[in-house]
Amino acid sequence: MNELELKYGCNPNQKPSRIYMEDGSDLPVTVLNGKPGYINFLDAFNGWQLVSNLKKATGLPAATSFKHVSPAGAAVGLPLTETLAKIYWVNDMDWKNFSPLACAYARARGADRMSSFGDFISLSDVCDKDTALLIKREVSDGVIAPGYTEEALEILKQKKKGNYNVIQIDENFVPAPLEHKEVFGVTFEQGRQELEIDDAMLSNIVTENKELTEEAKRDMKISLIILKYTQSNSVCFVKDGQAIGVGAGQQSRVHCTRLAGQKADNWFLRQCPKVLNLPFKDTISRAERDNAIDVYIGDEYMDVLADGMWEKTFTEKPEVFTKEEKRAWLDQMTDVTLGSDAFFPFSDNIERAHKSGVKYIAQPGGSVRDDAVIETCNKYGMVMSFTGIRLFHH
């Protein structure tokens, strides 16, 4: 089959809509269940490239959680800790025995659960039962993978009253070297982004501190691969094999860094005992808990703590999580990696990154203020690599 008719394009008024192969060859995907839409396929094809790249770069199964053609989270399949299992709401499952692929999706979904609500999932490996059971309990639009075990497929087919979107992709498919995009009746042509992210790209270390651990190299590569498929401008914070904050689609570089940094801060604040032990009512769903936590750790905390409000969510009124307590907890976050899809024009990005525990940075370099950026990195003992490669994605 070389074309697939879709219900509509980006919006219901944009008809007709389809995906097809211009050369008449077969599509590299098969819809096993549901009726994926235009944006679903945009997420699926971008996400599949991302997880394929992660698997190739690290040798580990990978997963990503996409929303509106940018990743909310992405990760490789490293084991979960008890704390991560709690903040990702999988501690009621057999998380200690999760498959690596299930661990990857738990991490990808868990990094920014607010943004991942209603995600499209991409998996680097054949979807197994563990991963399918994890997906089954989350609000999600669909999944793409190179295959599904029989058990996993039956589990996924039960989602959304049988309408959950399940796509299988030919993992051996190689697109043409040139890609085309039409805007306002004008066709754009460019070579595909086939750049491989590897250790050699990290070799130009420009800071006084030049000590890169193997874990830091892994996380730097992960950050750059995530940025490769994130709408620009973009910045990505990574720790322990997973994104913990993605700032996408901002016109200002420092706003990217602030956005991603705040998401990273929220990820770490959720691990504080004061948040882990919030007295939720048993009737409160995971999504409602995510929303409540997001407000509780933010500046508008009285929206959930005011009299007449806290009773809706908690069995007893929680104490305020003070600014001083939050700062003291965040000061314990260390060894975070930061990637940027283009150079940092000012050192304010580094100052903000430092507040979120960043120690390792990968960016192209090339700003007229590189010296000031390097000086600020040296002030904090950071390690920064100039990759020489821009990673814009539109």
Locations of regions flagged by a protein language model:
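Conserved helix-loop functional segments at active or binding sites
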Residues: 53, 229, 266-270, 355, ...
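Active-site loops and adjacent core secondary-structure elements that bind or stabilize anionic groups
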Residues: 1-201, 216-234
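Flexible, glycine/charged-enriched surface loops at secondary-structure junctions
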Residues: 57-65, 166-169, 232-239, 269-280, ...
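Substrate-contacting helices/loops that form the catalytic groove of nucleic-acid
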Residues: 177-212, 270-282, 286-291
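Glycine- and Gly-Pro-enriched alpha-helical subdomains that act as flexible
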Residues: 72-113, 244-343
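C-terminal binding/interaction regions
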Residues: 119, 123-124, 137-167, 172-174, ...
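Active-site-proximal loop/turn and secondary-structure-junction residues that shape catalytic pockets
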Residues: 70, 127, 239-242, 250, ...
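Gly-rich Lys/Arg/Thr-decorated short loops/hinges at beta-loop-alpha junctions or inter-strand turns
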Residues: 23-35, 111-117, 193-210, 287-309, ...
